[in-house]
């Protein structure tokens, strides 16, 4: 007897391939934060659904945005620092 799936998983797709007008740029942290966990780790492409080409570029742009101080390295740490200084 073969195992039959109860449901078919939803097909993941690359947001950047689907929408050519969506800019992948370090100056847009509002888009980049969707691909970073609350701990500051970059989410794997098997979870986000991005293609290999855009995942590489996404990683580069997130790191560049962090260097330019447009994004935090970790969001949890940044809120703890604010609480201690008050």
Curated annotation (Swiss-Prot):
Part of the 30S ribosomal subunit. Forms a tight heterodimer with protein bS6. InterPro entries: Ribosomal_bS18, Ribosomal_bS18_CS, Ribosomal_bS18_sf. GO terms for molecular function: small ribosomal subunit rRNA binding; structural constituent of ribosome. Disulfide bonds: none annotated. Keywords: Ribonucleoprotein, Ribosomal protein, RNA-binding, rRNA-binding. SUPFAM superfamilies: Ribosomal protein S18 (SSF46911). PROSITE patterns: RIBOSOMAL_S18. GO terms for cellular component: cytosolic small ribosomal subunit. Binds as a heterodimer with protein bS6 to the central domain of the 16S rRNA, where it helps stabilize the platform of the 30S subunit. The keyword rRNA-binding applies. The keyword RNA-binding applies. One of its GO terms (biological process) is translation. It holds the Pfam family Ribosomal_S18. HAMAP family: Ribosomal_bS18 (MF_00270). Belongs to the bacterial ribosomal protein bS18 family. This is Small ribosomal subunit protein bS18.
């Amino acid at each position: 007897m073969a195992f039959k799936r109860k449901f078919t998983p939803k097909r993941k797709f690359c947001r950047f391939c689907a929408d050519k007008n969506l800019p992948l740029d370090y100056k847009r942290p509002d888009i980049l934060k969707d691909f970073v966990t609350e701990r500051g780790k970059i989410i794997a492409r098997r979870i986000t659904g991005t293609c290999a080409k855009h995942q590489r570029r996404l990683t580069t742009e997130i790191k560049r945005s962090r260097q330019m101080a447009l994004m935090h390295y970790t969001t949890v740490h940044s809120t703890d620092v604010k609480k201690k200084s008050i």
